[in-house]
Every structure is written in C-alpha cells, then in structure tokens.
Amino acid sequence: DRSVSRGLGDVYKRQAYVQWMKEETARKHISEVAVMFDQPYKEPDCEIITTNDIDVSETDTAVYVIARNSGEGADRFDEEGDYRLYPHEKGNIHLLAEVYDKLIVVLNIGGVMDLSEMKSIEGVNAILLMTQLGNLGGDALLDVLIGKVNPSGKTTDTWAKNYMDYPSSAKFSHNESVHDEMYEDGIYVGYRYFDSFGVKPLYCFGYGKSYTDFEIKAGKISVEGNEIQIPVTVKNTGKIYTGKEVVQVYYSATGGVMEKPYQELAVYQKTKLLAPGETEEIVLKYQAEQMASYSEKEAAWILEKGDYIIRVGNSSASTKVAGVIEVCEDIQTLKAKNLFALDVALNEIHPDAVKLEEKKKEEIYDTLLSYKIPCLVFCRALKPDDMLLQTNLLMLSYFVP
C-alpha cells in the first residue's frame, strides 16, 4: 500500500493529514478525491496469455505491449517488473513468438529497461519504443504500426546490454543502503561513458530505425566568425516509403590538457519528409564555444589548443569523419566563478587516456589514405564585447573525395 496514510515517517501525523483531506473533500462534495486516498494507484498485475486466448485470434500478427510507470521521487530498480521483465512477460513473449508469424513488442515506458533477453527470443520481429505519448498516443502508435507514418525518432538514452554496464549501478543508493551518494561519473555521462570506456551498448545514443534507408554525405565545412557550418546532403535511397532522417554532428577533442570524452553531440537536425530517391541539402550550425571545457583552475570555460574532429552520421555509433578543426591556441570563452567546493574529494572514473586519444584519431588515419586534405585558415570576426581573444586563428581541414 503506497498511500500517504501508510508511508514513511510519523504514521499518526500522516493519518491525521489524510483524515483532514477526506473531511475536506466530503465537505466540498468531491467524493471521488476521497476515494483516491482509500484506493491508491497500484501497478496492475501482468496478465498471463493462454492458448485459449490465442485460439480466438484469426491473425498472423501479434502486438504485445510492455508498460512501466514513471514519475518524480521514485528511483528505478534492477528487479522484475521494473528494469527487468516479469516472468509472466517472458512467458507471454515466448508463447506469442511460437504461435504467430510476426510479433511486435511495443514499449510503453518512460525510461530504459533490460531488452537483452527479449532480443534473444527467436520470433520477435520488431521492438517499437512508444515511450509515454499522452492521451492520443494510441492513434500515433497505430499510424506507425500500419505504415501510415514512418518512424523517425532517435534514442535519447544509451540502452545497456547489462544493468551493471552503467557506471553508477554498483554504488547506487538502494544497492548499498547508503545515506550519501558520491557522484563519481564526472564528465562521463550516458554515451560519453560507453564511447570513452569501450563498453558496447545494446542500443547506442541517437539510434533509431526507419522503414526506408538514407544516405548521408557531408560537404565542405566552413567557419564564419564563431559559427561552424557543416553542409550535409541526405538522400532517401529506399524504393517504397517516404521518411525523415535525423542528421547528427559530433566532435572529438584531441591534444588538450583537460580530460575530454571520446565524442560529444554538437548539433542535430531532422530532414523534411523525403520521398524515395528524393534529396535534401541542409546546413547544421553550432558555435565553437560549445566545444570548450570548464577549468576549475582558471574558473573559466576554455577552448583548448588542439584538433577537433568533426563526425557526421545518424547515431553516436554510426558516423564518418567530415573534417578537422585546429585551434591554434587556448581561447577563454567565458570567465566564471567556482562555487560549492567539495568537502570530500571525489574518486571520479577515468578511462585509459592513451587508448582514448588513439581511438579518437583512428578513423582520421583511415580517411587520410583515401582523401586529400586541403587546409584553410580563418581569422575570427569577433565583436568587441566577445570574450574570445581576437587574435586567435582557426585552421580548418576538410575532406574532399
């Protein structure tokens, strides 16, 4: 029972509070609200599908929906019925996969969950992430299932193969029953951790399939003032479905003193609806200051000297090097102030720095074998009130087939 009257803390005080609420709602003739206190929400039990249920079905396709609730003030748990499947859910999926020619599993959830076992079940043809779309979500879901609308969404989280692949999983509060949680992930949050530490996820950040295929080609990168511009041509190479693609631009910072992850998302943009064979040219833009790192020593954001590798693709794990921007010297982009100094030092996680630098540059070496790299030098056109140093130069290297 998760009602307020039986929650944590002083039971009598909480019961008195609820009693007052009941009296108040009764006085105002709002009986439905009072009933809610007597009957708090409880997750429904998973229904077991039987062969009798299947016998009345005359279709060759089954759609099985897995639901998980989400909300504020409630941690997720690595347990059945939350992060993991209920035993009944596993049994239902196995049965449906054996009986039906096609099985689609829909995830009506607000966060990640363990899909490794589900992916291993032979006969699961598709997994559709519906998330929580609101009161009209059913209409949107049906449009996608029948092909009226082509899905074009991308994952905003990294879906791990195993719960323990998440860096905080071993020390999260409910695992050790601690009162204080030491945040030791540092800058390695989400895909930054998986990419930098070489942990292969089940589904990477920015992942999402379509009923059609797309070809993404990056053009000549340019720099205007502080703005980096990446022209990209996107073509629907499929023959049946129209669709949209999300082009993603990442950068890898190399050669600096401050620690940096393997790559970070700089900008993304969704195309218009493209018919089979149709092409669209878009220009993705972002400010160079976005690539700066915070220095506690200087109490400032610094765009460090070094190479900044620009990668273009449709997910964090599917990109190609489009060019390299060389920053010739350190640039202070914003002066700040250190606040809330730590009372206890954090033992933050760190990847192998040497291997990480090699990984960042690995794709460049492969690209150099087949591409010529002309170098252009750009002088920043800065406003007087711009905090960047006006004497700095950006040297741009771009790849031309």
Please provide the spans of the model-predicted regions:
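Single conserved hydrophobic/aromatic residue that forms the stacking wall/gate
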Residues: 1-12
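Hydrophobic anchor at the start of a short beta-strand
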Residues: 10, 101-104
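Secreted, periplasmic, or luminal enzymes acting at the cell surface/secretory milieu
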Residues: 13-41, 108-244, 250, 305, ...
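Hydrophobic helix-and-loop "lid/oligomerization" segment in the mid-to-C-terminal part
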Residues: 20-97, 105-122
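Short beta-alpha connecting loops at secondary-structure transitions
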Residues: 81, 123-131, 167-168, 172-177, ...
